[in-house]
Amino acid sequence: KGMAGTGIALSDSRRLNFANPASYARFDSLSFMFDVGVTLQAEHRSAGNASRNDYRAQFDYLAAGFRLAPRLGFSFGLRPFSSVGYELATQSTSLSGSGASSALTTTTRYTGEGGLHQVYAGLGFMPLNGLSVGVNAGYLWGTTTHSAYTQFSNSSTDALRRSYAYEVRSYTLDFGAQWARRIARRHEVSLGVVYGLGHGLHGSAEFYNQRISGSAVQSGDTVALRNVFSLPQTVGVGLGWNYANRLRLGLDYTLQQWGSATSTALETLADGSQVFRKADN
């Protein structure tokens, strides 16, 4: 979490940096490193005379690393790949005639929850002085759900529920390299590159469109698709500067080709019908 996640070109003998697996090659032989990241968030929201306080804790990552042999380091850990969490509502009133009894109030509640998690293990090796290479292999899994539930003030009108859920499980593979050179007694510059493999993901996506009376589903459609998601390939480069192990500066640039990845789309046709299908971004 330090330096806002910058680290493609940075390495340290006593600090974990899973932004580039090549950094594991510089682990200290006398250290076993263990790192946990947690975010605590407090929010105060107000609108008119109403106000609300929210408090939230979020797990960021857990990682450990140690030296296996001279010039060879190992790291493993668990970290969220993505997270979803929201809840909001909208309300509108329409008139179908004259008088208060003709007013129809529509309330829609939107919710989203879930996320993807990643467990990984990686190796970093230094074949030449100043040059190190590394690889992270991981497993990705998780579920995410987005829902919209619409209710009407007229009890004779059925509620509507539309829900989109997907489940993913697949592997991840990331490669990295670093080169460092001391240019003065206390100054070291470094260059790093990383590459994340893009590929299709195993899993499923489902779309539900239901009419609900009370707590019972009166009618509805369910459409399921399999193996529709893919990860884009990722390329990153970084520059680093280290002054006497007291001051570090880093600059990273990362490109993710989401335009070539696939996901799902709900398409409305000319006749008003809808199609849930695989789509390119």
Predicted segments, located by residue:
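N-terminal, post-signal peptide beta-strand-biased segments of exported outer-membrane/organellar beta-barrel
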Residues: K1-S82
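Outer-membrane beta-barrel porins/channels
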Residues: K1, R67-N281
